[in-house]
Structure formats: structure tokens, C-alpha cells
Amino acid sequence: MKDEMKTPVHMGVGGEAIAVGVLAALPEGSKTFGTYRNHSLFLAAGGSLEAFFAELYGRLPGPGKGKAGSMHLASPEHGLMATSAVVGTTVPLAVGAAFAEAYRGGDGVVAVFFGDGALEEGVFWESLNFASLKRLRVLFVCEDNGLAIHTPLKDRQGYRSITQAVSAFHCRGDAGDGADAVDVRSRAAALVSAIRREGG
């Protein structure tokens, strides 16, 4: 082995349909934020394979000039504003972007992707509460594989349904097959339409 990649690489194999389906449902010009499992999100947003691999190898023309690595891929020119290695930290950034959009009088939608482990972070619930209170146009996309590291939801939370838990904040929720891009797109499009019409 040559030890050529100087970055941790967190694969998202099997979850590609989520990024593809959601991004296909978003209006043009939407902003997105993601997690460290961001490869499919970066590529679905329009980032090039050349830039993707350059970043993993720590070289130009990586989107982070070869310094961001796999876990911090971004492509603002394609609407992918930020991803982060720290669990849950792009959720408040996305809510802030949606607040800025509303403050300017725009009707754009912001999407934020996160794993179900991010629901253990207080900042998730604080962000959800603020988005609900201000009726911000944010699509919260939970990529739920049922585990945070190795711990199932039933051993981490008192609730069993994420969509029911967020409904307490008067937010719409839906759950579908994350391996079916067509199903994801259909569900996301319905939510985006409602969000644009009525706010969060």
C-alpha cells in the first residue's frame, strides 16, 4: 500500500438514492448542507469526479484545494455549502441559511442531511425548534440506518418514530425507502412543495 490518501474516508455506500432523490426534488438554486458521509451528496450536487478524487488525494483541483479532505467536501457553486466531520454541526448552519433567505424575502429551500445519530445532539432539537418557530423553509433529511455507531435507536431514545418525534414541533414528516431514488424524490418533492407554500 502506498499511503497516498491523507484523509479519513467515510463511505456512504447504499445511501446514494437519498442524495440523488432529494436533490432532484429541490428547486434550482437551493442550498444544501451535509455530513461527513457526503460523497454521493457532492457528486449529486454536480461536483466533478476529478475534483472529488483530487480532494481525497490532497491535491488541486480539489474543492478544498486538497486541504479539506473527504469529510469536509463542499461545492458552493453547486449549492453544497458545507459538510462536517462533527456530528450534527451543519444543522444549525442550514437553519441560519434558511433564516437569511427569509430575512431577504426569498422563497428558496435549504436542505440539510444528517444521520440518525445527530438526533442525540441538542443542537438538532434547538435548530428544529427555531425553524418551526420562524416557519423557515428547511428540509431536514435524516439518513436513518437505525444505528448511531453500533447502538440502535431503541437503546438511545425514548421514542420509536423519528417522524412522530418531530411532529411535536409542528413539522411535517415522512419516511420512505432510502434505497429507492424515485420514492425519495416523490416524497421530497411533496414536502418541498408544502414547505414553499406554507413555510417549514
Q: What residue spans do the PLM features occupy?
A:
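Cofactor-binding active-site loop characterized by glycine-rich and histidine/acidic residues
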Residues: 4-134, 152-158, 163-170
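Charged, amphipathic alpha-helical interaction segments
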Residues: 101, 132, 136, 189-196
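Thiamine diphosphate
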Residues: 142-200
